[in-house]
Amino acid sequence: MAEGLVLKGTMRAHTDMVTAIATPIDNADIIVSASRDKSIILWKLTKDDKAYGVAQRRLTGHSHFVEDVVLSSDGQFALSGSWDGELRLWDLAAGVSTRRFVGHTKDVLSVAFSLDNRQIVSASRDRTIKLWNTLGECKYTISEGGEGHRDWVSCVRFSPNTLQPTIVSASWDKTVKVWNLSNCKLRSTLAGHTGYVSTVAVSPDGSLCASGGKDGVVLLWDLAEGKKLYSLEANSVIHALCFSPNRYWLCAATEHGIKIWDLESKSIVEDLKVDLKAEAEKADNSGPAATKRKVIYCTSLNWSADGSTLFSGYTDGVIRVWGIGRY
């Protein structure tokens, strides 16, 4: 019996591209999503046939596209980054923004929480990486001069490795950089991509890092050594990457579908494509009419903490939910 993924349902409330999805680490029945409709939505997962989740709260305040959103480990707060140049911290229970982080001079493209939630990192089109405390004070800026990136910083993530606290960043300068969190000094520059790098993901144990972007190739790196291990061909622009929390799988959101690799065999386990016709027949069209685009593709994705469910956000504003099944 092979394991595969089947479409479990859809979640409709965003009116533009879904840019990011955050899932709680305790596997609670909520997720949070960010969109180019300038809002963040807190969803309650109902797991119904028609709608897998319902919008519980819409968080508004950003004045431009919201590009990224992450959850605190206790699930109480969401952190977002926007093209308005700001980060915001949101109290999910109250549905309000409790803090604004001002300092970037251009669009914020990526945000992340450290493991203990006491530190925040952000990446921007101003070519900097900023480290903040939760009070909204910028503690350190890694700038373009010296060791910093030479172009937009598109993605930034903390490694879950507590022994070697690390920040990983990806950039339009075609590199991935690995930084020591303790002093914000460069540990290694990972070069190998031939086009801009739009996304980076760190494996659950903190040993591996995967990067992808314009060249359609996923590169896997040994984080401790700063060495390239191998590459996987997606043959299409890559918008997002994530590791499964409990299988040796890597998922890529590409312009030609969601590709899932088994990293042991380096083979594709699944290539998920959307059947819009079948979806239209199943839906009762009660949700808001998303912008009509002929070609849609996945722009964001994240696993549930138990690895049973893959949430994927698309250019048409719909979140499609895939579940592990056997066939």
Swiss-Prot record:
InterPro entries listed in its UniProt record: G-protein_beta_WD-40_rep, RACK1-like, WD40/YVTN_repeat-like_dom_sf, WD40_repeat_CS, WD40_repeat_dom_sf, WD40_rpt
GO BP annotations, alphabetical order: cellular response to abscisic acid stimulus; gibberellin mediated signaling pathway; positive regulation of signal transduction; regulation of translation; response to gibberellin; response to glucose; ribosome biogenesis; seed germination
SMART domains for this protein: WD40
Summary of the tissues where the protein is detected: Widely expressed.
Subcellular location: Cytoplasm; Nucleus
Name of the gene: RACK1A
WD repeats: 13-44, 61-91, 103-133, 148-180, 192-222, 233-262, 293-323
SUPFAM superfamilies: WD40 repeat-like
Effect of a null allele: Shorter hypocotyls in etiolated seedlings, epinastic cotyledons, reduced rosette leaf production by half and late flowering under short-day conditions. Reduced sensitivity to gibberellin and brassinosteroid in seed germination, hypersensitivity to abscisic acid in seed germination and early seedling development, and hyposensitivity to auxin in adventitious and lateral root formation. Plants show a significant resistance to water stress conditions by limiting water loss through the guard cells.
Family: Belongs to the WD repeat G protein beta family. Ribosomal protein RACK1 subfamily.
GO MF annotations in UniProt: MAP-kinase scaffold activity; molecular adaptor activity; mRNA binding; ribosome binding; structural constituent of ribosome; translation regulator activity
Full protein name: Small ribosomal subunit protein RACK1z
Its job: Major component of the RACK1 regulatory proteins that play a role in multiple signal transduction pathways. Involved in multiple hormone responses and developmental processes. MAPK cascade scaffolding protein involved in the protease IV and ArgC signaling pathway but not the flg22 pathway.
Keyword Transcription regulation: no
Domain of life of the native organism: Eukaryota
Primary subcellular site in the record, as a coarse category: cytoplasm
Pfam family, one: WD40
Keywords for the protein's UniProt record, in alphabetical order: Cytoplasm, Nucleus, Repeat, Ribonucleoprotein, Ribosomal protein, Transducer, WD repeat
Organism in which the protein naturally occurs: Arabidopsis thaliana (Mouse-ear cress)
Assembly notes: Homodimer and heterodimer with RACK1B or RACK1C. Interacts with NUDT7. Interacts with GB1, MEKK1, MKK4, MKK5, MPK3 and MPK6, but not with GPA1 or MPK4. Interacts with OFUT20.
GO cellular component, one term: chloroplast
